[in-house]
């Protein structure tokens, strides 16, 4: 069957439960030492394997969550606003890592995001949700969709079209990268990305 890896938006590590990264990664997992070492190197967490989970920075913790999701060699990697709680530098580093994994692994990626700029510049397909599927398709098609324009306005649609045009020239991946843009909260966008509009709609992933 389809193997799915999931990276949540955040994980609150309780300092009263002193679990180390190495132990956390292998909880309910069958990965051996060699597999763990490979994934740790892939996600740049080799140096923090013996650190307690609760002392990690936001970026370190997200890489650990990503590593755990990759241990099972998923066919589909689901990322739920994985960089929302990171600073700009951390976001760039995390998404660069995602692009590297996407390029090197036989994996499809579904990312939920409110970052329209990210969605339009790095995804192959966008699904825009606002209580229902408003529009979907390749980024340049979505930015021209009447419902997208109605949600975000002409100025935002034109700006996003610039990002999608640049993406059309730069993106040469061969497998699926789906971005869901979620409008349920403040606007943003995703890769193979899904865009969900569940809460207040604010033009901004």
Where are these regions (language model features)?
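Conserved ABC ATPase "signature" region
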Residues: 33-51
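Conserved ABC ATPase signature
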Residues: 52-56, 60
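Conserved catalytic motifs of ABC-family nucleotide-binding domains
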Residues: 73
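Catalytic Walker B motif of ABC-type/P-loop ATPase nucleotide-binding domains
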Residues: 77-81
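Helical segment within the ABC ATPase nucleotide-binding domain
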Residues: 92-104
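H-loop/switch region of ABC-family ATPase nucleotide-binding domains
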Residues: 113-114
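Conserved beta-strand-loop-alpha-helix hinge in the C-terminal portion
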Residues: 132-159
């Amino acid at each position: 069957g389809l193997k799915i890896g999931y990276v949540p938006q955040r994980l609150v590590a309780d300092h009263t439960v002193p679990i180390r990264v190495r132990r956390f990664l292998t909880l309910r997992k069958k990965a051996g030492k060699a597999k763990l070492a490979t994934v740790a190197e892939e996600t740049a967490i080799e140096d923090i394997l013996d650190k307690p989970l609760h002392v990690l920075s936001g970026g370190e913790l997200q890489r650990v969550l990503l590593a755990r999701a990759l241990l099972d060699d998923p066919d589909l990697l689901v990322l739920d606003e994985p960089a929302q709680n990171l600073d700009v530098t951390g976001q760039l580093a995390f998404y660069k890592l995602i692009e590297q994994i996407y390029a090197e692994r036989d994996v499809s990626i579904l990312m939920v995001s409110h970052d329209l700029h990210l969605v339009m510049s790095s995804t192959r397909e966008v699904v825009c949700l606002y209580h229902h599927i408003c529009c979907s398709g390749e980024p340049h098609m979505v930015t021209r969709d009447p419902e997208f324009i109605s949600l975000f306005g002409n100025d935002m649609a034109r700006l996003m079209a610039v990002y999608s045009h640049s993406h059309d020239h730069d993106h040469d991946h061969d497998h699926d990268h789906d971005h869901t843009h979620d409008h349920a909260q403040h606007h943003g966008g995703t890769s193979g990305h899904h865009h969900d509009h569940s809460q207040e709609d604010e033009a901004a992933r």
